């Protein structure tokens, strides 16, 4: 399971011109799910994301987590995080989990976050979305539950 975690001032997702999710200060998470992912990957990434100390304290040090600041989180499914561009010029998405199986793991991930964070918004799994991200910093962290980078 992979995530691009961005510290944001605000973020929102639109589908067919309608805002379906929005947040204020917090994290925008683009989430990719692979064919090998399990509930253990969900647990690992959830704990890592909500406890990442990427928010500034009173001394402007990155010492506070999303939980510490009571921030919001928006989670957007993005299978393209498993795009393999090592051969040719067109990405291969063969490692990405698709369809119903990916939707189930995505929803389990969202539910696990909702148990910890007050304001959780999402995109629409499988939809063509417009994602608006107002970065803060910018601070962008790449995470992989298989620790490949």
UniProtKB/Swiss-Prot annotation:
SUPFAM superfamilies on file: DTD-like
Q: Which domain of life is it from?
A: Bacteria
**Alphabetical UniProt keywords:** Cytoplasm, Hydrolase, RNA-binding, tRNA-binding
The reaction(s) this protein catalyses: glycyl-tRNA(Ala) + H2O = tRNA(Ala) + glycine + H(+); a D-aminoacyl-tRNA + H2O = a tRNA + a D-alpha-amino acid + H(+)
Annotated function: An aminoacyl-tRNA editing enzyme that deacylates mischarged D-aminoacyl-tRNAs. Also deacylates mischarged glycyl-tRNA(Ala), protecting cells against glycine mischarging by AlaRS. Acts via tRNA-based rather than protein-based catalysis; rejects L-amino acids rather than detecting D-amino acids in the active site. By recycling D-aminoacyl-tRNA to D-amino acids and free tRNA molecules, this enzyme counteracts the toxicity associated with the formation of D-aminoacyl-tRNA entities in vivo and helps enforce protein L-homochirality.
One GO CC term on file? cytoplasm
Name of this protein: D-aminoacyl-tRNA deacylase
How does this polypeptide assemble, per the annotation?
Answer: Homodimer.
């Amino acid at each position: 399971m992979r995530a691009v975690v961005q510290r944001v001032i605000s973020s929102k997702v639109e589908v067919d011109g309608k805002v379906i999710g929005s947040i204020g200060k917090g994290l925008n998470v683009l989430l990719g799910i692979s064919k090998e992912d399990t509930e253990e990957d969900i647990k690992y990434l959830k704990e890592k994301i909500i406890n990442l100390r990427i928010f500034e304290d009173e001394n402007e040090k990155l010492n506070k987590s999303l939980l510490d600041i009571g921030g919001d989180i928006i989670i957007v499914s993005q299978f393209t995080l498993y795009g393999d561009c090592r051969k040719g010029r067109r990405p291969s998405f063969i490692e990405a989990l698709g369809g119903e199986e990916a939707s189930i793991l995505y929803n389990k991930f969202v539910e696990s976050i909702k148990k910890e964070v007050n304001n959780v918004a999402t995109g629409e799994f499988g939809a063509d979305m417009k994602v608006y991200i107002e970065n803060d910093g910018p601070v962008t962290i790449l995470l992989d539950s298989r620790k490949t980078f």
